[in-house]
Amino acid sequence: MGEAVEVMFGNGFPEIHKATSPTQTLHSNQQDCHWYEETIDDDLKWSFALNSVLHQGTSEYQDIALLDTKRFGKVLVIDGKMQSAERDEFIYHECLIHPALLFHPNPKTVFIMGGGEGSAAREILKHTTIEKVVMCDIDQEVVDFCRRFLTVNSDAFCNKKLELVIKDAKAELEKREEKFDIIVGDLADPVEGGPCYQLYTKSFYQNILKPKLSPNGIFVTQAGPAGIFTHKEVFTSIYNTMKQVFKYVKAYTAHVPSFADTWGWVMASDHEFDVEVDEMDRRIEERVNGELMYLNAPSFVSAATLNKTISLALEKETEVYSEENARFIHGHGVAYRHI
């Protein structure tokens, strides 16, 4: 068996190596493995056996890697944090995209902040009501290598309804005159020195994002880990921040195996957006092309039924996310090395 060995970049992003010794080989003909280790906290790491490293480097904005893992297939890693895995990304992306679109009476236009791998756009474009999707990602390099290697999303990138913009989502959303039925935050986790944390702040939600929502418009964002031990990292503060800006806010969670944790999303609007279970399933049947692999009405009801610990934490949270008072996931972005 191989041993996971890290050689760390200056900002803590691990380079993957292979180490061997006679005691690590169970059989004389067994191949040693490369392993990737993700640091979850100072005293906790997850390890993933690799087939190969498809891409690894540093763009202008973030450290990026695309790994071919034995268990989860191709995996996108940004600033040392797994963002998406081929085998189970459908859980994350179906939960991120479909509830908001199904709760809206007739969604036609969507703006995606981030989403460079193309999976969010793929799910949105399954909806027959959609006329236009703007996907705005800051990092051309991420988009380019995802288009090359994540072929499952090739149809989305070629769809005439998709407008791809390489730019800071905050600046792009601010300059646009149109309004959108749905705005999606498919952003990397907020890490210190990363490019995304400003897009989780109250000032951004209130002054830039909310004015770009059409009547009945819904905003939904990924909100980080939401497990028993991890929900206070950013999940509860993102939820509370959105409560300061929107009249109706709903949090929901699901377990994502490749993240080794429960994940959280938060949806918000100034217009009530709940629908009955039967109506939600009816809309899936009428509006969505193809079969969803994870989400149906009962599974969403389950996702939005939070356990006592998480419910109380959301209720008691007082922190409001701001540039001066930001919470971060463990780790550092590219800009941190220049601080």
Curated annotation (Swiss-Prot):
Gene3D superfamilies given in the database record: Spermidine synthase, tetramerisation domain, Vaccinia Virus protein VP39
Substitution effect: E123K: In acl5-1; loss of function
Catalyses which reaction(s): S-adenosyl 3-(methylsulfanyl)propylamine + spermidine = thermospermine + S-methyl-5'-thioadenosine + H(+)
Short name of one Pfam family: Spermine_synth
Null mutant phenotype: Severe reduction in the length of stem internodes. Increased thickness of veins in leaves and inflorescence stems. Altered morphology of xylem vessel elements.
The protein's Enzyme Commission number: 2.5.1.79
PROSITE patterns: PABS_2
Family: Belongs to the spermidine/spermine synthase family.
Name of the protein described by the UniProt record: Thermospermine synthase ACAULIS5
Lineage start: Eukaryota, Viridiplantae, Streptophyta, Embryophyta, Tracheophyta
